[in-house]
Amino acid sequence: YLQRLYSVVKEEDPAGLVTYVNYPTTEYLRLPFLDFACFNVYLESQDRFEAYLARLQNIVGDRPLLMSELGLDSLRNGEEGQAHSLEWQVRSALGGGCAGVFVFAWTDDWYRHGHDVEDWEFGLTRVDRTPKPALAAVETAFANVPFPAGLPWPRVSVVVCSYNGSRTIRDTLEGLARLRYPDYEVIVVDDGSRDSTAAIAKEYDCVLIRTENRGLSNARNTGLAKATGEIVAYIDDDAYPDPDWLTYLAATFLTTPHAGVGGPNLAPPGDGPIAECVARAPGGPLHVLLTDTVAEHIPGCNMAFRKAWLDVIGGFDPQFRTAGDDVDLCWRLQSRGWTLGFHPAAVVWHHRRNSLRTYWRQQIGYGRAGAMLELKWPEKYNGPGHVRWG
């Protein structure tokens, strides 16, 4: 029924965005045809609200999440209590990666079936439209999105390793130039390219390091050695970041003890039918979560680490020349008792292979890397040779 309604709307307005307002009690409804997801959530505990928000982000997957209702009744909680709660609700929702928030409601002047509603007061204003403290609190929260100004943002070094990446690296560097983050540098490691990768990199504000071709892990370590940031973030040369990518990664480092943090890598639209099929095929670069916010694996196209901890473990293992280095690094960090985090809004757009030939070649490389990982980490594999995640 809901899909039929969706189709009717799309017939009338093909460019319009369609959603369905859902509730926690019916979160089991999987509606992948919707353009974005909406939930009404009323929770008075900040910890529980943030935990449930993380759950919802994983339920909705690649689609934007909108908080279509949140609020608190001042009749039972007091006007100051309402103001305090609404401020953290808005901050938590936007800091947790929601695309937007609706606060319920504007005024206490409310009707139902032609009668005044007098047993609750959810409004930001009173019946006479005079503002309650919640109005100023919400205004303050919305004025500082996705995070309050003045946080002690760490310096971040973004490392881009490239081998013959001239076809896509310009998009990567353009995206990095548009980042909304106060303190970062870009380091491009040209791993012996024979195309125009280096010439393109020279057009941008970045540190360019040219080496002979020594493989991906060595290139990552070269960038690590040059990095001046407290955090080192890695993005592939066939990906480009959301403008707030570093902000969400860094915010997670500020609020958790994680050794590393990653986020989703989504296939950009318009890459063609083969790339779209590859994006849906098995064997892609996906994160592996242990909980809604803790990961076992964050893929190399979108990962960031505390530099000091990378230095402690000696960086990336050079034997992994094309793939597998990210998995090995994640396991080595966790073997020391450290954890990896995940933020659903730390998004990069990652081009998939757009031909069967390049996809097949990629999968061969992944297979070789998997065999190397099994030799190094036999306890991580079962009898048939499959990884036992978690």
Task: Describe the function of each predicted region.
Residues 244-275, 339, 351:
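Conserved donor NDP-sugar-binding/catalytic core segment of glycosyltransferases
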Residues 2-94, 125:
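Extracellular glycoside hydrolase catalytic/binding regions
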Residues 211-227, 289, 293, 301:
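Glycine-rich, basic loop-to-helix element that forms the pyrophosphate-binding segment
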Residues 104-152:
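Aromatic-rich peripheral "rim/lid" segments of glycoside hydrolase catalytic domains that contact
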Residues 175, 190-199, 239:
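A conserved acidic beta->alpha catalytic loop
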Residues 232:
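Short aromatic/hydrophobic "clamp" motif used to bind/position activated sugar donors
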Residues 105, 340-390:
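Active-site-adjacent helix/loop segment of glycosyltransferases
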Residues 174-183:
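Short, acidic, metal-binding catalytic loop of nucleotide-sugar glycosyltransferases
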